[in-house]
């Protein structure tokens, strides 16, 4: 029995993009975008962690909903945040707030990147037609 040839699955690209930022684009063969997105999103996460003194991604915080959009790297940083939080967290510090915001933006950005990977595979020819004048 011959099955029709299918390309990469958009759902797999979406899930891979959540686990590792940019992996959905790598799965689709867009290596340049994959590297760019991985570096940008992971860089935002690390910059936010450094700014916030390593205590910005913690369980039980509302911000984790946004930060969790960055997927695997965000959840991998939770034990580090827990370790640094044992010595106390300066919740009112501007650097802590800015670091928290950076990590949340990384999560939201990764959600957009995941949607891009999904849409490029689900609708490969959308937007390529020129409008008739």
Roles of regions detected by a PLM:
Residues 23-31:
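Active-site beta-strand/loop microenvironment that shapes enzyme catalytic pockets
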Residues 30-38:
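Alpha-helical transmembrane segments and their helix-start/interface "positive-inside/aromatic belt" motifs
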